[in-house]
């Protein structure tokens, strides 16, 4: 018996085993989400089974390898309970999976998470693209009013395909942040053009251009000899004082625009048309359902998975309005607070703040903010490893 106890103590004393538990659960959740976003045949039983299995793996990592002060531990339980209540009332699971991964990512090297994300999401994207081009799965094609053809390339909808590419690019840029070359910027601009041409996805094309612009301008300001120190200082001060609040600022603007929308105003009508009716759809959902503390199950009727005409389209695309109405005020506040905390922990890393800003802009129109198969950035909240974990990393050469 003592031998088993000794082996157990030795096992939990090595944080590497905690990493294995986390990444096993992370890969399972990530692969499930990616597979559901493709046109490949779906197995509902396996999809449902993957959630408790992944939760068990990550839960074991948290229980056996993570240590918190009492106040922080109680706060985490409040967050988890509020999230679970939100999922119960909204009949959704994405919020729970995101919070579970946020809690489980404690002391996990963030770039490892990004690289695993890049491999899994990239591999499924390539597989779906190739399968759709040779006819193994359907390449859904939609025709706009202007006769432009939109391709989904094996994903359930063209904008979901382009969104995957945008989020992959945010990860690639961050990983390559210290060795950025002109070819990366030019290639990304070209990708934005390709996405616009084949998918007619304005949002993700513009989001990629914003990402390229932030990285290019930021690198020029930081490294170019012709830029004065005064400009460098102002740039840094802006991002470290205002940039860390980019998500709540953009969330308030998005929700405010939705609630202030008036169908009798030319300005609001034109803006609503430019945003593909996002404002009117969001406002209608608010009037019909209201805002609740822990959310509500709102039936979403949208495009995707089929090319059949949808007559009663009713989908809340704006992430911030979506979270507020579906997941409730409690989880909405938790999410914004986590993003602020995440940015504050990475405040010295401007490239991290650039990525969050680009994602925040994208989420004004798209609904992917708590879908881990798209948005992995909130897991950066665990980037600051404890002293004990740092020593383990250094001794095992994990970097």
Model regions and ranges:
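Membrane-proximal cytoplasmic C-terminal regulatory module of class A 7TM GPCRs
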Residues: 393-399
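Juxtamembrane/transmembrane-helix boundary motifs at the membrane-water interface
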Residues: 31-49, 304-313
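Long extracytoplasmic/lumenal interhelical loops at the membrane interface
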Residues: 269-327
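Hydrophobic transmembrane helix bundles of membrane-integrated enzymes that assemble
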Residues: 2-33, 47-66, 71-266, 315-391
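A structural signal for alpha-helix termini and helix-coil/disorder junctions
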Residues: 37, 288-291, 367
